[in-house]
């Protein structure tokens, strides 16, 4: 809606779409590089801190709001995100089976996993250029270091290369423990990691 500068914020029109019960916690707003979109991480319900964190997209020219990531196309929370330089997709981190992976989602809502299923947690996500990302990564075996992720056309096939090895001199003196997945059956018959 248009802003009427002669009225206070309380008396402005509200952009409220049919069925939009946007009352939950919103955070991390970002404009797309081309300035056409505003995105933010959004929870649906007020006062429910375990609510799913979705990625909301607002098209500035039309006032249309949609969710490029929600439970329909990614069954986990959006942690952090950054826009691709061409404004056609968004890179994000999300936790799946106790590891934080990097994903890419287009404006068409198609989600592609960028990194593989290894036991690592990625964070501090940033775009370096059209083909590379910069991120921190740690695991149960290694402390945080910085990595360059070179994108690939195939899902889960990005090349991941360490550019720091801050604690390598310490880890080289230690025996490497073994880390294993352990799934247990829950009381309702499901599997839990």
Where do the model's predicted regions map?
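Terminal RNA-binding accessory module
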Residues: 102, 193
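Conserved beta-strand positions in repeat-built beta-propeller and related beta-rich domains
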Residues: 93-95, 137
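A structural signal for beta-strand boundary/capping segments at domain termini and interdomain linkers
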Residues: 189-191
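Multi-bladed beta-propeller domains
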Residues: 1-27, 42-86, 95, 104-123, ...
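Residue-level detector of Asp-centered blade-edge/turn motifs that repeat once per structural unit
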Residues: 33-34, 85-86, 128-130
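Structured, non-catalytic alpha/beta "coupling" segments that mediate domain-domain communication
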Residues: 126-152, 157
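Hydrophobic beta-strand positions that form the internal "hydrophobic ladder"
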Residues: 35-38, 89-91, 114, 132-134
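Short glycine-rich, flexible loops that bind phosphorylated cofactors or substrates
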Residues: 47, 99, 142
């Amino acid at each position: 809606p248009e802003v009427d500068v002669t009225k206070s914020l309380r008396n402005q029109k509200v952009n409220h779409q049919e069925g939009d019960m946007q009352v939950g916690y919103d955070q991390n707003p970002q404009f797309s590089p081309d300035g056409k979109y505003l995105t933010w991480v959004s929870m649906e319900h007020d006062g429910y801190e375990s609510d799913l964190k979705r990625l909301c997209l607002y098209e500035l020219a039309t006032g249309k709001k949609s969710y490029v990531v929600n439970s329909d196309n990614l069954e986990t929370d959006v942690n952090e995100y950054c826009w691709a330089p061409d404004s056609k997709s968004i890179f994000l981190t999300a936790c799946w089976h106790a590891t934080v992976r990097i994903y890419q989602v287009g404006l068409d809502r198609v989600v592609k996993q960028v990194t593989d299923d290894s036991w690592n947690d990625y964070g501090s996500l940033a775009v370096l250029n059209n083909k590379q990302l910069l991120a921190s990564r740690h695991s149960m075996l290694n402390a945080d270091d910085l990595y360059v992720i070179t994108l690939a056309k195939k899902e889960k096939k990005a090349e991941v290369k360490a550019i720091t090895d801050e604690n390598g001199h310490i880890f080289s003196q230690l025996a490497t423990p073994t880390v294993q997945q352990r799934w247990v059956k829950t009381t309702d018959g499901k599997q839990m990691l």
